[in-house]
Amino acid sequence: MKTTIGRLALLLAGFSFAHAQSAAQVKEELAIALRILAHEGVVDAYGHATVRNPSNPSHYFMSRNLPPALATAADIVEYDLDSQPFSANAPPGFTERYIHGEIYKARPDVMAVVHFHAPDVIPFGVTNVPLRPIFHMAGFLGGGVPIFEIRDTGAPTDMLIRNPQLGAALARTLGNNSVALLRGHGAVAVAKAPPAAANAISGAVPNPLHVVVGEAYYTMINARLQMQAIQLGGGKVNYLSDDEARMAGAQDGFERSWTLWKSEVSR
């Protein structure tokens, strides 16, 4: 009972970001996030993003099954943590919504999730070269990114996270990290609950949707730069130290990036 209460308290604490946001506003922000991810090349026709419902952290919002660039607030559907639609009349959803529901179950501190197939990240999931932070905008990658091996779950699959069991296995691989790779598939990025105090850089409490979009984008950019550095340096790369990654990870919630990206998809 104490564990359940503690988890719920953590969930509710994570929603300081949403005090001024209604569910309708969060849906609109999610639609904008999807269009940004598409505009910046993080997703194409495939990929998805979600955010917890600020009024009910045991539910999350996700678009119906359509290309991210086409999403509007009217396309956003509410799901419970079993990834079942709240409304009996909900339109068809994504097959891989279990990625999101199972991560939210396992990680009460996670407020938003992005799953993406950016080509830049794929090589790091199929080789013995770990994805590590190479520049200051990717400090959130920490000491390296874990890789989800779907073969370890048992029966052969088509690589997709089609059920809660596969989603839970992915969540275990993610652990307490911000990013995990899926071998031969893509990656997942998560935004943790913002701190109660305002960010020391921006003076504002970070918005998890802005954070997770920034993490997905800069994971893609870091992978691209790391590949170039490996080729240029013959495999010898000067990565961020653990301290540098930790300190660089305390960015301003990518608010400046979000402001630019939002203006670009709003024109």
Describe the function of each predicted region.
Residues L11-H19:
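Hydrophobic h-region of N-terminal signal peptides that target proteins for export
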Residues K2-L11:
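Sec-dependent signal peptide recognition
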Residues A20-R267:
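Glycine-rich flexible loops
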